[in-house]
A protein has these predicted regions:
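Non-catalytic linker/capping segments at the edges of enzyme domains
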Residues: 1-45, 49, 150-152
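HotDog/MaoC-like acyl-thioester-processing domains
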Residues: 1-11, 80-83, 97-99, 104, ...
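Short, charged/polar surface micro-motifs in flexible loops or helix N-caps
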Residues: 39-40, 49-52, 70, 99
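A conserved, well-ordered hydrophobic junction motif at loop->secondary-structure transitions
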Residues: 48-49, 53-66
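Active-site helix/loop of acyl-thioester processing domains in fatty-acid/polyketide metabolism
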Residues: 62-83
Length: 152
């Protein structure tokens, strides 16, 4: 007699985002935190510290871009537990990020088909609500589980 193999439940988006955060050195370096995670949407927060400033005292654009990449990467990988990598992104800087404030990154999956996905990330000052940047990113899914599915 062959024993039946129980079905394997894929991890949910929040579990995947938490796992990615715990295993991502850039997430730790930027002192990010998870505010919300669901399938197709992730919201992260990052304090704007003096170490992230440019020559003129505003948040360095490259740090804003790195944070946005984390936001849409977490969103894409968590939606279906399939590994993906950023293949392109475009950023529109709208206002300077101010040292001493918190930057919020709200990423949303806008389209996904086959091995490709498009994501929008809205980056805003948490206190004032001022929009700091908007990023449009493209993800290429390379296959494989982000984290292995767990048996119930």
């Amino acid at each position: 007699m062959i024993d039946a193999v129980p079905p394997v439940a894929p991890p949910d988006a929040e579990t995947i985002v938490r796992w990615m955060a715990a295993n991502n050195p850039v997430f730790a370096l930027l002192k990010c935190e998870i505010r919300h995670a669901s399938s197709g949407r992730t919201c992260l927060a990052m304090p704007i510290t003096p170490e992230l400033a440019n020559t003129f005292g505003a948040m360095h654009g490259g740090m804003i871009f790195a944070f946005a990449d984390l936001c849409f990467g977490f969103t894409a990988n968590a939606a279906q537990n399939v590994k993906g990598v950023s293949s392109s992104a475009e950023i529109h800087w709208l206002a300077p990020g101010k040292v001493g404030t918190t930057l919020i990154g709200d990423a949303k999956e806008t389209w996904r088909e086959g091995r490709n996905g498009l994501y929008d990330v809205y980056l805003a000052d948490e206190e004032s609500g001022e929009m700091i940047a908007i990023v449009h990113g493209r993800m290429r899914f390379i296959g494989g589980d982000v984290i292995p599915a767990q048996s119930d």
